[in-house]
């Protein structure tokens, strides 16, 4: 990576500003999934071990007005982080002001402080989300000229807490998580070991047009599953029953199929039901057609067998988006079959691009079998599309 990293700067005795992604699910004050906190630990521990004084910034959820602040404080995160690190995490509970400044100035080497939810600054004019120059300058002034961005999940956004701070410090560098995310995803797309197979699921073609086009030029095969497969199948003249479809994208789907020249792999059969919720009948189709009154909610046995064929010998696999409604046990066999087909390939570099695919791998017990699971759905999508991430572009060149 052509950007400075946390290992390139002297940290001892410095107040080091760190953007992390602690946007974790919290229910009744309890964190229900702490993966993002765990993912940030290597960078945080390194800064503390080097004698840095870590000042952490993160958002949590969306905050547009005062009422939205309920349940959005980072207080439970400070507590969880303290337990994981085995040391106190100072939490003044504010995003600016004399109390915060005093607490930061009192930090000693190897100590850590967490600033309150950066999106609390969005209540009065979206200062965080719109990268208010004064806010970025103020937050930058709280440190000693070093900013570490380790929040890949927000790297595709230009906010005051990443791009804004970067513009007002001497050195803006990447943390270990950000460095790894870029290394795995960018390298997989730009310099893959071949055969390179990309798998795209999810519901809408419109969400992934740029990704499909970029990957068609880079991958040896692009497997399409999930809801967006039905738009491609309808474009080819197949019956899709009451399945999800984007009729306004049929011409685009035809164009992509022509451009793909056989690289796009679609389902061969489906697991269907007579309703999305409250269904009374579930069955497998004999082929690519779906009968009237039924909707496709997963791929079926022929497609799962085809996944094994298509993935045989693959050396690089990038997967973004489930191929069925995996949250429902009736419709998770396709996603499980796909994961099985990926992880059994010898020597494969297997990468999951965050979001629902990551949730599927974690919930279904496959997480530790993949080479890398991204922490950022939107950011990984933009990398797969070949876009420049603002949070990364703002870092200091080597």
Curated annotation (Swiss-Prot):
GO terms for biological process: gluconeogenesis; glycolytic process. The keyword ATP-binding applies. Disulfide bonds: none annotated. Pathway: Carbohydrate degradation; glycolysis; pyruvate from D-glyceraldehyde 3-phosphate: step 2/5. It is an enzyme of class 2 (transferase). Substrate binds at residues 21-23, 36, 59-62, 119, 157. GO terms for molecular function: ADP binding; ATP binding; mannan binding; phosphoglycerate kinase activity. It comes from the Bacteria. Keywords: ATP-binding, Cytoplasm, Glycolysis, Kinase, Nucleotide-binding, Transferase. ATP binds at residues 208, 296, 327, 354-357. GO terms for cellular component: cell surface; cytosol. Pfam families: PGK. It catalyses: (2R)-3-phosphoglycerate + ATP = (2R)-3-phospho-glyceroyl phosphate + ADP. Its EC number is 2.7.2.3. The keyword Iron-sulfur does not apply. SUPFAM superfamilies: Phosphoglycerate kinase (SSF53748). It is found in: Cytoplasm. Monomer. HAMAP family: Phosphoglyc_kinase. Belongs to the phosphoglycerate kinase family. This is Phosphoglycerate kinase. It comes from Lactococcus lactis subsp. lactis (strain IL1403) (Streptococcus lactis).
């Amino acid at each position: 990576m052509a950007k400075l990293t946390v290992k390139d700067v002297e940290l001892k005795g410095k107040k080091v500003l760190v953007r992390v992604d602690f946007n974790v699910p919290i229910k009744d004050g309890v964190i229900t999934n702490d993966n993002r906190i765990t993912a940030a630990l290597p960078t945080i521990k390194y800064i503390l071990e080097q004698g840095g004084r870590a000042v952490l910034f993160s958002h949590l959820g969306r905050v547009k007005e005062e009422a939205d602040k309920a349940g959005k404080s980072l207080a439970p995160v400070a507590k969880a982080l303290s337990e994981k690190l085995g040391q106190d995490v100072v939490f003044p509970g504010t995003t600016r002001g004399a109390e915060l400044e005093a607490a930061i100035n009192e930090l000693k080497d190897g100590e850590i402080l967490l600033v309150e939810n950066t999106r609390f600054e969005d209540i009065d004019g979206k200062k965080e989300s719109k990268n208010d120059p004064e806010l970025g300058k103020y937050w930058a002034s709280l440190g000693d000229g070093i900013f570490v961005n380790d929040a890949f999940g927000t790297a595709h956004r230009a906010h005051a807490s990443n791009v804004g701070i970067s513009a007002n410090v001497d050195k803006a560098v990447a943390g270990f998580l950000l460095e790894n995310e870029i290394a795995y995803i960018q390298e997989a797309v730009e310099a893959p070991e071949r055969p390179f197979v990309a798998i795209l699921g999810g519901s809408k073609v419109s969400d992934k047009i740029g990704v499909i086009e970029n990957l068609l030029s880079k991958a040896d095969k692009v497997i399409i599953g999930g809801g967006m497969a039905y738009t491609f199948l309808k474009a080819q003249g197949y019956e899709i029953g009451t399945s999800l479809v984007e009729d306004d994208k049929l011409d685009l789907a035809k164009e992509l199929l022509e451009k793909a020249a056989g690289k796009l792999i679609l389902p061969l059969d489906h697991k269907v039901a007579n309703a999305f919720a409250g269904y009374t009948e579930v069955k497998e189709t004999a082929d690519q057609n779906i009968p009237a009154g039924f909707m496709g909610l997963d791929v079926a046995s022929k497609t799962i067998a085809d996944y094994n064929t298509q993935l045989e010998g693959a050396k690089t696999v990038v997967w973004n988006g489930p191929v069925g409604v995996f949250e429902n046990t009736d419709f998770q066999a396709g996603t499980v079959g796909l994961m099985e087909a990926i992880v059994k390939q010898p020597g494969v570099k297997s990468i999951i691009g965050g979001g629902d695919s990551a949730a599927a791998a974690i919930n279904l017990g496959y997480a530790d079998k993949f080479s890398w699971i991204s922490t950022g759905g939107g950011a990984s999508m933009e990398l797969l599309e070949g876009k420049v991430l603002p949070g990364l572009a703002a870092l200091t060149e080597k």
